């Protein structure tokens, strides 16, 4: 008999993903085999499972919180927006097609049977499934074909807890309005409310909580304070909310260009956790002035974002910063942009386009997507700020549709081990001031990260830090801190009771 509970939100970015991770950690600490599940995730932050399947980063870090290996069944449908109207549809970890919103809405009913089968297969292996909704269940225009909120709760026959964000204001209206827009059978499935991201004296909420409970008949299970925990965000909404502006003074400042279609910005969480590093996401040319390193991150639409770089003045600013001796790094789409030429006869149909010209490379887009976890070794000789990283082992994952070929003047940055073969990856110039790679997650390799940060310190005349920061241990501490706070501020016993009362045979 598998127990399950689903967290749905009054809106996007109310904190569902983090609270799901917290519940996964709590149940894991309590000795229960626990798995996260989100039937459909729309995000540009994705990762790769050990068997080469692509899934949302949120479910990956939730699986880590539960102490298990990420499994693509935890996120069977992943939507990766390529424009305001189109998205790449990834089914069970592999690209299926590209669709516009209307076409996908019509397509969703065909996914129900597959989603339910995947969910049931997980339920047969775990004691508890913690499900996550998307956006709000009160999107009445999407209700008839819903597969991720109440539609999924109905398929799983599980109770729902509604999460509301008080930090954005209007929390009681959001709770009341959401419940009012649900059908009665949907409303009956909601067994509790969590008020999230509260700052101040909780006593000020008591009268409001009593009234909302009286009005809705749904109990408030807890009020979570605004937590200073360092955990991954699901999508770019967090970048818009100033979480990553990085105003605290640190020895090293790293500027990451916030591309319109930025993907996998979780690549930089380990960098941001370094005690001597300040990360800043920037969209204005003048914000580059104090950067010790500039990074062009991954992109879901490389040529569109390259055009934005030029139109916004960011391209000129990056090139000027490079001429002043500041290193520039590119990851995946950012690596492609740093090259001389990009040939796209697949994604945009724009043909051959010039890159920024900092690396003498040619990239050709391809139909097939590379998705794999890899171990790699940095090249034995690396110049400049990268020198201390020479020969170091690193680990990461590839998600890209294209191949990049080095021309004269570029050296290979690292060697990947793939299917028993050694494969060259990345490019670096002779002076080390331009460096690119397809490898996501590179900075999760602690020794590499400390080596390159110390290389940046040396450029400023600062002594190296001898202690290597362990990012895996840091993440584990954050999961434990989250679980501790949730036990303190949420009635976890009540959640256990809710799950037991609605326990269903699989």
From Swiss-Prot:
Role of this protein: Catalyzes amidations at positions B, D, E, and G on adenosylcobyrinic A,C-diamide. NH(2) groups are provided by glutamine, and one molecule of ATP is hydrogenolyzed for each amidation.
Keyword flag Glycoprotein: no
Gene Ontology terms for molecular function: ABC-type vitamin B12 transporter activity; catalytic activity
Subunit structure, interactors included: Homodimer.
Residue ranges of domain GATase cobBQ-type in the record: 251-448
Keywords on record: Cobalamin biosynthesis, Glutamine amidotransferase
Source organism (scientific name): Salmonella typhi
Phylogenetic placement of the source organism: Bacteria, Pseudomonadati, Pseudomonadota, Gammaproteobacteria, Enterobacterales
Protein name as it appears in the record: Cobyric acid synthase
PROSITE patterns the record matches: GATASE_COBBQ
């Amino acid at each position: 008999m598998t127990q399950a509970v689903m967290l749905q939100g009054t809106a996007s970015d109310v904190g569902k993903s983090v609270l799901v991770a917290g519940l996964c950690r709590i149940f894991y600490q309590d000795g229960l085999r626990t798995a996260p599940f989100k039937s459909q995730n729309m995000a540009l932050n994705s990762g790769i499972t050990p068997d080469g399947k692509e899934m949302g980063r949120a479910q990956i870090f939730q699986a880590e919180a539960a102490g298990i290996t990420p499994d693509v069944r935890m996120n069977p449908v992943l939507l990766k927006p390529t424009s305001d109207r189109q998205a790449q549809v990834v089914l069970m970890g592999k690209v299926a097609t590209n669709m516009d919103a209307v076409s996908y809405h019509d397509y969703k009913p065909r996914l129900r049977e597959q989603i339910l089968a995947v969910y049931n297969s997980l339920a047969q292996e775990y004691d508890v499934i913690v499900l996550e909704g998307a956006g709000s269940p009160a999107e009445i225009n999407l209700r008839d074909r819903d597969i991720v909120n109440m539609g999924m709760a109905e398929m799983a026959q599980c109770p729902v807890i509604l999460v509301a964000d008080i930090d954005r204001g209007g929390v009681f209206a959001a709770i009341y309005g959401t419940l009012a827009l649900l059908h009665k059978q949907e409303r009956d499935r909601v067994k509790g409310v969590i008020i999230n991201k509260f700052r101040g004296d909780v006593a000020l909420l008591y009268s409001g909580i009593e009234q909302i409970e009286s009005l809705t008949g749904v109990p408030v299970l807890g009020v979570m304070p605004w937590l200073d925990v360092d955990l991954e965000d699901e999508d770019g909404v967090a970048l818009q909310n100033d979480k990553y502006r990085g105003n605290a003074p640190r020895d090293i400042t790293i500027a990451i260009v916030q591309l319109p279609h930025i993907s996998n910005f979780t690549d930089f969480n380990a960098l941001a956790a370094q005690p001597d590093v300040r990360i800043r996401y920037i969209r204005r040319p003048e914000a580059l002035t104090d950067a010790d390193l500039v990074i062009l991150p991954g992109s879901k639409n490389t040529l569109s974002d390259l055009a934005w770089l030029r139109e916004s003045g960011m391209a000129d600013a990056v090139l000027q910063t490079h001429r002043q001796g500041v290193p520039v790094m590119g990851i995946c789409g950012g690596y492609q942009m740093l090259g001389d030429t990009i040939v796209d006869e697949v994604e945009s149909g724009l043909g051959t386009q010039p890159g920024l010209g900092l690396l003498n490379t040619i990239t050709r887009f391809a139909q097939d997507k590379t998705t794999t976890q890899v171990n790699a070794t940095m090249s034995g000789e690396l110049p400049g700020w990268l020198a201390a990283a020479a020969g170091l082992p690193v680990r990461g994952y590839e998600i890209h549709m294209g191949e990049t070929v080095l021309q004269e003047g570029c050296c290979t940055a690292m060697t990947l081990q793939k299917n028993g073969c050694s494969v060259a990856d990345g490019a670096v110039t002779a002076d080390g001031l331009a460096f690119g790679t397809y490898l996501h997650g590179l900075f999760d390799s602690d020794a590499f990260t400390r080596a390159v940060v110390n290389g940046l310190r040396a450029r400023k005349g600062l002594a190296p830090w001898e202690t290597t920061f362990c990012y895996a241990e840091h993440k584990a501490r954050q999961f434990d801190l989250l679980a501790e706070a949730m036990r303190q501020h949420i009635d976890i016993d009540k959640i256990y009771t809710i799950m037991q009362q609605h326990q269903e045979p699989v």
